[in-house]
Amino acid sequence: MDTVTTNIVTTDIRLLRLLQLSSVGLPVGGFAFSQGMEYAIDQGWVKNKTEVSDWIGLQLQQSLARVDLPVLRLCMDAAKQQNTERLFELNDLVLACRETKELRLNDTAMGEALFRLMSSLQIDTPFKRLDEMSFVTLFAIAANHWGLQVDLACLGFAWSWLENQIAAATKLVPLGQTQAQELLGELQTDIRHAIAMSLNIEEERVGAGLPAIAIASALHETQYSRLFRS
């Protein structure tokens, strides 16, 4: 009976850690970036709930599934093996996959914020304060530190990203709160498919190209007025 109770408590603690790490309340600033969506909406490329779903769903399948989630898995493996050199290599890889300065800033700004938080929570990392750190890499280190399974860490990462994107769309299109919840429900299937795809992608196959999103992100810098950071 004691063993069963211990297992339940351990599982509950890990679930709570997953919720903590993937919460939109995590102070890393994910809400500050639209990842090109603001420009796309301003130009009329994305005008309604259906087009928001297409825009976000494409990124889940072609970007997160082929870059962020595979690197997250590989970083968790490296962290588990305490392979610092490998972590730095993977960190460089994911940053090299960012197609614009804005997308790279999105990743490193969130990475720097998570680094500060992890330091406060006494989670060790091999990085130093002035290093250029990917949010993906640090998320993986934190997930490994808390004993999360790879598939659950990927789920939490993707869910957090999805919530931030839909929150941005809710402000920009704009969408109603009910429509936002409908989108969260619709795109859960895309998350599941993205994770399944990512588990089969090794380092040499990491990479994706989404020209429209890269263009939107690059041109967002000179957009006349912006709600989101560039």
UniProtKB/Swiss-Prot annotation:
InterPro entries named in the record: UreF, UreF_sf
GO molecular-function terms, A-Z: nickel cation binding
Keyword vocabulary terms for this entry: Chaperone, Cytoplasm, Nickel insertion
Gene3D superfamilies according to UniProt: Urease accessory protein UreF (1.10.4190.10)
Record text on subunit structure and interactions: UreD, UreF and UreG form a complex that acts as a GTP-hydrolysis-dependent molecular chaperone, activating the urease apoprotein by helping to assemble the nickel containing metallocenter of UreC. The UreE protein probably delivers the nickel.
Record Pfam families: UreF
Role noted for this protein: Required for maturation of urease via the functional incorporation of the urease nickel metallocenter.
GO cellular component assignments: cytoplasm
Chief site of localization: cytoplasm
Family recorded in the similarity comment: Belongs to the UreF family.
Name the record gives this protein: Urease accessory protein UreF
Location relative to the cell: Cytoplasm
Annotated signal sequence range: none
